[in-house]
Amino acid sequence: MSTVAIVDFGSQVTQLIARRVRELGVYSEVFPPSTDFQAMASRGIKIDAFILSGGPNSVQQLHGVPNAVSDVLNLNLQKGVPVLGICYGFQMLAHYFGADVAQSVAREFGRAWLDVIEPSSITEGVWSLGSKVDVWMSHSDSIVGEVPQGFRVVARSADTGAVAFMCNDERKIYGVQFHPEVAHTPGGREMLDNFLKIAGCTRDWTMGSFLHTQIGAIKSATDGGRVVAAISGGVDSSVASVLVHKAIGERLVCVFVDTGLLRKGEASVVRDLFVGKLNMHVNVLDKSALFMQRLAGVQDPEVKRKIIGETFIEVFEQEAKSLGDIKFLMQGTIYPDVIESGVGESGTKIKSHHNVGGLPEIMNLSLVEPLRHLFKDEVRLLGKELGLPSAILDRHPFPGPGLAVRIMGEVTAERVELLREIDNIYIDMMRDSGLYDHIWQAFAVLVPVRTVGVMGDGRTYGYVCALRAVTSSDGMTADCFPFGETDERKLEFLAFLQKVSRAIVSNLQGVNRVVYDMTSKPPATIEWE
């Protein structure tokens, strides 16, 4: 199986490069700039192509070249491994080979136009010689003067004349100032496809091949040891647990912790799904009192996540001891969790996830995270490959910390119960209306702000609740629903929201105002905390 290594210099869209390559049938993995690729090669680990990502820094600030870049270009020289640099990666290549890179007089952000002045195997079938093409730019630095020796210019900015695409055909090194991985660059997917053809990559990465590889990896990693699985009933932990069960069978022990922060009737739903449909035994632990006690008086969302993560691990360590010789803890961590938590060296932390940033530094169980490098849509595809029912795979994402991060401010028993009922009304009505399967994720948020209202002849003073519904494919970007729908569809959804608002206010004491969150991701995250 071919592998493309992506060196991550901190771009918030690095994961999109990985997704695009995988969509083209080639396995890709993201590595930090400190990676020793020469050592990997000496151990027989074969990389078929390298992509250097964009990033927020400037090559003018560099004190020497990152180890990974030196390794990549040495492997290119020694073994002919093709290299593609994108944005900062392009500037890094130019800098490495001796070109001057400096801050641009005119920076380019967003849509930009290029003049195509030379042909290239990367743009074959995509751009025509002499044409003007639009791309997506996001950069402050540019090459000043000539491109490095051995390189030629394929395209320049129509506005500034700056080099936008250079290549060294003999060494199969390509640098683009724009972002071919984003949807805003027409033909970007085809350019990446051409790069993979140049690298001679085989198109054999599928969920079937991933499943086969992971089963072997799980068997090897656990080495006959027993694993306790943290399941929630959500898509990620369900797929992960079924995958691990397929690999090691009864050595997997599934544990469901009722934190008191879950959706209405969640424990019963989990029992029905795992025992009734998957024939897997589940130990249910009611730890709601413990979690509520630990969260008392806490308002900061990062502190809440940290407390929940630490308490989860504590509970599982205790359960592992009671079960006997348990050495591993399985979690349903997926790639967006890792990216948003800023675990990589160059990434910017957005918020911690209890599966990642919420973990204590010292833990007595080794982690098994079989989905760590998969995006949400890939997890669902893997679930289908494993034969999981749609009742599991079609569920909307639910955060590990549960309702605690959908209650702004302090978490109290009263607020949890109120939000649980609000959310249940919203989701039940969404299912009844036929909207549920058209929406990536929908939920309610309780805002600790009280507003004045009137019901009957009396004054009310209740909480505000916010409703959210978004469309997405992988959770990395999202639009509020019904963005992009027809005007008729938008009016229908507005009428639906009015019905939900009336149902919430009429049936629940404590809420007298309902609002709808119209924000996309970015600039917001999907969850409020």
From Swiss-Prot:
Key words of the record: ATP-binding, Glutamine amidotransferase, GMP biosynthesis, Ligase, Nucleotide-binding, Purine biosynthesis
Entry-linked InterPro entries: Class_I_gatase-like, GATASE, GMP_synth_C, GMP_synth_GATase, GMP_synthase, GMPS_ATP_PPase_dom, Rossmann-like_a/b/a_fold
Catalytic reactions of this protein: XMP + L-glutamine + ATP + H2O = GMP + L-glutamate + AMP + diphosphate + 2 H(+)
PROSITE patterns given in the database record: GATASE_TYPE_1 (PS51273), GMPS_ATP_PPASE (PS51553)
Keyword field contains ATP-binding: yes
Record's function text: Catalyzes the synthesis of GMP from XMP.
Name under which the protein is recorded: GMP synthase [glutamine-hydrolyzing]
Organism field: Anaplasma marginale (strain Florida)
Primary gene name: guaA
